[in-house]
């Protein structure tokens, strides 16, 4: 998985046609997709079976370019059989944007499904809070450093840090 991630990251960074800022990107495209790779720091072992890493695929739509509001949905799955998976819907906003760098904050809800360490299945809603520092490396592609906190009412919690790469189309 790590070799695939590094290969795709290098391919995105080597594309030609550099944009001057995220404002240039938003003039052309409203939809975007990204792939995220996370490391888990604060994962309740009862619900995560000691998972250490995870990957996510995100699809999004920018519906207000001036305010920087985006709606995104993520499908998230661990690499192990009994670890949790989630489907989330997040509202994102650009907290800071300057040329090729921006900070994106997000809040959302997710449904998390998995097995406990007693092998009992669970399905729980969670609250998601996130922040991402993103750098525009090509005309429509960016790389980012992400932080995400998920917390549910039955004790499920996870704090994740990771990298992402995505593009607008």
Predicted regions and their residues:
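Gram-negative (and chloroplast) outer-membrane scaffold detector with strong preference
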Residues: 58-127, 135-141, 166-169
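Transmembrane beta-barrel architecture of outer-membrane proteins
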Residues: 30, 52-54, 84-88, 124-128, ...
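Short glycine/proline- and aromatic-enriched beta-strand/turn motifs that initiate or cap beta-hairpins
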Residues: 19-66, 72-75, 162, 166-168
């Amino acid at each position: 998985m790590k070799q695939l991630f590094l290969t795709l990251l290098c391919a995105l960074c080597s594309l030609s046609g550099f944009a001057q800022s995220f404002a240039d990107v938003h003039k052309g495209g409203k939809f975007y997709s990204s792939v995220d790779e996370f490391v888990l720091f604060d994962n309740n072992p009862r619900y995560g079976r000691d998972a250490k890493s995870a990957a996510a695929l995100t699809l999004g739509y920018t519906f207000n370019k001036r305010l920087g509001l985006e709606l995104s949905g993520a499908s998230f799955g661990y690499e192990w059989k009994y670890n949790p998976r989630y489907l989330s819907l997040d509202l994102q906003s650009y907290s800071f944007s300057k040329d090729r760098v921006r900070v994106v904050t997000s809040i959302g809800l997710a449904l998390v499904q998995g097995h406990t360490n007693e092998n009992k299945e669970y399905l729980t809603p969670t609250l998601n809070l996130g922040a991402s520092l993103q750098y525009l490396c090509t005309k429509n592609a960016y790389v980012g450093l992400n932080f995400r906190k998920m917390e549910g009412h039955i004790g499920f919690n996870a704090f994740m840090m990771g990298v992402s790469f995505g593009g607008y189309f």
